[in-house]
Amino acid sequence: MLLKFCGAAREVTGSNYLLEVNGHRILVDCGMYQGEHEDANEAPFPYAANSVDAMLLTHAHIDHSGRIPKLVKEGFRGKIYATLPTIELAEILWDDSVRLMSEDAEWRSAKNARRGLPPTEPLYRQEDADAAKKLFEPVNYDARIEVSPGVSVRFRDAGHILGSSMIEVLASEENKVVRIVFSGDLGPMNTVMERSPAEITDADYVLIESTYGNREHKDNDATREEFQTLMKDIFNAKKAKVYIPTFVVDRAQRIMYELALLRGQGIGTGMPVFFDSPMGVKATKLYESHMDLLSNEIQSYRRNGGNPFGSEDVKCISTREESQAVNAQKFGIVLAGSGMCNGGRIVHHLKNGIWNPDNHIIFVGYQAHGTLGRAIVDGAKTIRIAGESINVKAKIHTIGGFSAHADRTDLLSWADRFRPTMPHFLVVHGESEAADSLASALRTRGFEACVAERDQEIQLVPREAGQKISEALEESRAAPRPVSIAEACAPADPGGAATEKEQTETVQPGALKRDERNAEKHARRANRRAVRSLENIADQMRDIFEKAESGEVSAEAQPLLDAVAVLLDSILHRSRAD
C-alpha cells in the first residue's frame, strides 16, 4: 500500500497525490501549478496516465483540478468522483482555462512564425476538457462508495468553497486496513459563505493543508469592519476607481455579499460595481442554485428578501468591448479575475488604473510567489504588463480575513479532533515556512508529523488502536523500499557537530534518499528560476522587436535582433525540456 506525493509538497499549487492499493492506482486531485512553478505544468506526469484507475477530486479550484484534461489527453479513462457543485464549477473553470491557453498559444505561435519557429501548443484543447467532463461521477456528501477493489471513500464538507470536500479513504489490502484522510483545502471554522468543515476523528494518516500554517486571520467581525471602514472612505471621496482582483469562485461572491451589506446601511448606493468575469457570472448562478449548501448567514439573508450576490448596482460584463468601456468610467468598483493578477481581465484594468494615485487596489486573497499580484503586494514600484513598464501609484490594500482557507489556529483545532486515534500527519499544500511551522506545532501537541516532499513515496501500514505509526512500522514486515514514515520524517541530527566518520556511520538509507530528492528539487527550482529570468528578458525585448518590425531600428541591427530571438527561444526550449 503506497502513497506518492506528486505535487503541492512545500508549495501551494499543483495538488496531486497517488495512492496504490491492490495493484490499482487512485489519484487525489490533479491541479495546475501557478506562480513561479507554472512551468511544471508542461512536465510529464510521474506515472502513466492510462495506468490510473480512478480520480478523487476535492474541489474545483484550478490548482486542484486544472491538469485533469491533460491527464485525459494522455490516456486516463477512469471515473472522476466529485460532488455535483464541484463538477459544475470545474466544467466552467476548464472551459475558461482552454480559452486562456488557446489565446496564449495563438499569440506565441504568431510571434514564432515571424521568426521561422514552430507553433506553440496549448497544454490541452477543448476536446480534451469535453472528454474529461464525460468521466465525472457525482457523489453525495457523507455517502460511502467503493471506487476500486478494497478501497471505499466518503466525501465530507470541507467548508472551503461550494462543493469542496475532505475525503476519507478506507483501504484494505491482504486483510490489512488503513484509514487515510485528505483534508483538501479546509475552510475556516467560523465561516461566512460556507458551512463549517465536517468533523472527522478516525484516521491512521492525515494529509493536512498548510497554506496559512504559520499565520492567523482576523476574525469575521474585524475583517468586515476593516473592509467597511475602507470602503466608506472611498465612497465619500467619489473620485476613485477601486480594483479588486478576485478569485471568481467564492471570493467574488463573498465580496458582492459584503457590498450588499454596505448598501443595506445606505452606504455606497449608486456607486457602480462592474463584475467583469463571464466565468464568475456563471459561477454566481451556481452558488444561487445550491444555496442549501451555503452558511446559515447567507441562507438567512436570502430568506429575508436580500440578494447576497447582486443588486441593481452590480453590472455583469460579458464582452471585451464592455470590459474596455469600463476604463472610461471615472469611479466605480471593478471585480475581475484572476485573483493573483497572472491573467484574466484584471490585468488590462490594472494597466489602465494602477498608475493613478487616486485609485485603490484591494487584494482580498492569497498571492503566490512569482505572480504579478505578489509583486504588487510586496511593494513593487513598477510592473510590466504586455511588455510595458507601468508605475505603481495607486493605493495598495490587503485584507487577509476574507480567506477561504483555515488559518493556523483553525488547522490545529481541526487536527485536535483526531486526538482519539492519534494519526500521523503529513503536511502538504503550503510553502516551506508555513508547512514546517505547522508540522512543528503538531509535534508539540503530541502528534507524529512531517512535511511531505515532492516525489516522495511512503508505505502505509495499519496499526492497533492507540499505537503510533512508528511503532507499527517496527512490527511491519513490509519491504524497506519505498521509504517508511520513520525514514521519511526522521529528524535532523540535533547536535550538528558529528565528525565525518560519525556521519558516515550513522547516515541511514532513507536520509540518503531524502538528500537526493532535496538535491533534485533544488535543481528543478534553479532551472525554473532560470527559465523565468529568460522569459523576463524575452518580454523586455518584445518592445525592441516590435520597433524593428515597424522600421524604427536600422537595417544593420535587424540580423542581430533576429539572432537574439532565435537564441532566446532555443535556450528556453532546452531549459523547459530539462
Task: Specify the residue positions occupied by each region the protein language model found.
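Pre-active-site segment of Zn-dependent metallo-hydrolases
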Residues: A9-G14, V21-K134, L186-R195, D378-A386, ...
